Curated annotation (Swiss-Prot):
It comes from Populus trichocarpa. The chain crosses the membrane at residues 16-36, 57-77, 84-104, 133-153. This is CASP-like protein 1C1. Disulfide bonds: none annotated. It is found in: Cell membrane. Homodimer and heterodimers. Residues 1-15, 78-83, 154-164 are cytoplasmic.
């Protein structure tokens, strides 16, 4: 089997989706890194994304995905690294889904708490922190969606000659 010929419009769409994935992941990283707030009443409390390892992992996954997306947006079209793109896209997609899902679970605990674990809700004391965390996770899911579209388009281009 020879190389699959990819139409120029599809290449432009995928490159645009990679650019959007870069923007979404870098914005999610920025909002998560900026999420910190201090509450004085009823007790002195400083909420920061570094308080939970899940949020650090979310930040790391989005940094990795944004660097990966930027690298592939800047990659020349004739490069042999494009052959690895679909495999790396699936890996990045899985990493982002896992970290975004874990981060949303932690954000849920921040919002509602867990009475059995004696984890009180903190979003009423530090609302700006919670808003930034939820915004970062929501934008991160936008990056997940971009990677999903890239994977669907790439697989359809690869399978199209086999199905016709």
């Amino acid at each position: 089997m020879g190389d699959v010929e990819i139409p120029p419009l599809v290449k432009q769409i995928v490159r645009g989706l990679r650019g959007l994935a870069f923007l979404a992941t870098i914005l999610a990283t920025s909002f998560m890194a900026a999420s910190h707030e201090r509450a004085i009443f009823p007790f002195d409390y400083k909420a920061d994304y570094t308080d939970l390892m899940l949020f650090k992992a979310f930040l790391g996954a989005n940094i990795a995905a944004s660097l990966y997306s930027f690298f592939f947006v800047c990659l020349p079209p004739k490069s042999l690294l494009w052959r690895l793109a679909i495999v790396l896209d699936v890996i990045m997609f899985g990493l982002l889904v896992a970290m975004d899902s874990a981060a949303i679970a932690a954000a849920y605990l921040h919002k509602h708490g867990d009475s059995q674990a004696f984890w009180p809700p903190i979003c009423s004391q530090v609302p700006t922190y919670c808003y930034r965390v939820i915004l970062a996770i929501s934008i991160g899911f936008g990056g997940v969606f971009m990677f999903l579209l890239i994977i669907i388009i790439s697989i359809s281009v690869i399978l199209n000659p086999l199905l016709v």
